[in-house]
Amino acid sequence: MLKMRTKPYSMKACLMALTWAGCATVHAASNDSASAVPAPVPVPAKPKCMNYDRYLTRAELAVKAVPVCGRISPELRGLREALAEHGLGFTATSYNGYTYDVLGHNSKPQVYNGQNPSYNASLNTYLTYDLTRVGFANDAQFTLAAQWVGANYTPANPRVTTMTVFAINQSFFNHQLELEYGYISGVRLFYGIALGGNASTAALGPSSVVPFQVGMSATEPTPTLNVITRDASLRFYNSFAVTRSVSPGGIAQDVKDNPSGFHLSVPDAKALFIDEFGYKRAASATENSAWFRAGTLYNTSHYTEFKTQEKSENNYGMYLAGTLQVSKPWGDARGWYLDSKLDYSPDSVNAINKAIQFTAFNVGPFVNRPADMFAVGVTKSYYSKELRDVYAGYGMDTANYTLAATTSYAARLTPGIYLISGLTYTHNPVFTPVHSDALLLQESLNFLF
């Protein structure tokens, strides 16, 4: 009844949070060079690779793309320049992960990610096009993205080849109105899971995240219209989306029903409405980075109620989240951040209906490692009482909650290559039967082109 699907979200979170540093490391390096020379020196020319950042996808509003200069071979042997001449941009990422419970709980069949040595690999490609070249207004951009995923533990990572983004983004009135329409998953637009991550996903997968339980799409894209309005400062915003829910059967069923990503509808999945109000501020010389948001989800799909086995009228959820830079030792985006999330949904139809998370991460933890990141965090996710009561009626023991504590370090080996090492202690790694605690070693080698 409780099906979980895993992707390396907790490891990807380390890499995505590094983008908060932006070009701060380049700025810091130039300041160091200037201070060592007593006489004025010419301002270094802007790196050519920075010109290609305008072609990075803008479709993923909740995730900041890694700058082109921070990737492997920024020029791609002249390919990026040739594409840019025609209004095109291209990027690719490859995530290659390993997870294993070092406490030695190997078993067949495997019931959670990492119980036996678990491997996964993915390739993500992005192609963008400047639509102003064909008459669209302002900064309109089209994004086409695709993903291949492979793994040896397929209940956690089904082997898929799918489209992930097929959408247009454009803004009006100096970015006070922004539109996103097409196929895209909700996690790329809302919530901000990439900041701080969620320690529970190490063993349970993204289905352990409450908004995904309620129907927000995490992997396969859904047809979406997203309208973002901002005040004149561009800091306060409201983001409202009409989209399709994932299958009420869960993420794995949604992948089965929509393997290509292009399906307009899937069985039993109806309209989902998402609204997020927030305040977002980038780091500057005088201000710390901050992002506070509150969101609600209303799903018109009919879910099977655990106790009655009847169909519900709807499903809904809400979340509060905040990410705040609390130190700025070098006057830029580097430093310590605190991230917290609080999620809620009804326990009549959602297997995990409440969660609370706290994370602290440090971008640029050492003066000579400005592109690294260190993170520690804890997540407590609560299983539905109504679902536990159903299992108790059959004499089956179940966990009340799962508690996961994680620590990780992301090291930039060279521009565009990151090694992320993590250790996650998980109390109750499965719902039923009650299982011994797990200590998951996670390694991920990531390549960004």
Language model segments and positions:
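Transmembrane beta-barrel strands of outer-membrane/channel proteins
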Residues: F90-Y98, F142-W148, L179-S185, N238-R244, ...
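N-terminal periplasmic/intermembrane-space "pro-region" immediately following the signal or transit peptide
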Residues: L2, L18-W20, T25-Y95
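Outer membrane beta-barrel transmembrane domains
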Residues: G249-P267, L272, E276-G278, T296-S312, ...
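Outer-membrane beta-barrel "beta-signal"
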Residues: D437-F449
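Surface-exposed loop and membrane-interface regions of Gram-negative outer-membrane beta-barrel proteins
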Residues: T99-A121, R133-F172, S265, P429-F431
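Short loop/turn motifs that connect adjacent beta-strands in outer-membrane beta-barrel proteins
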Residues: S30-D32, P67, S73-F90, V102, ...
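Outer-membrane beta-barrel architecture
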Residues: G78-R80, Y126-T128, A167-N169, N226-I228, ...
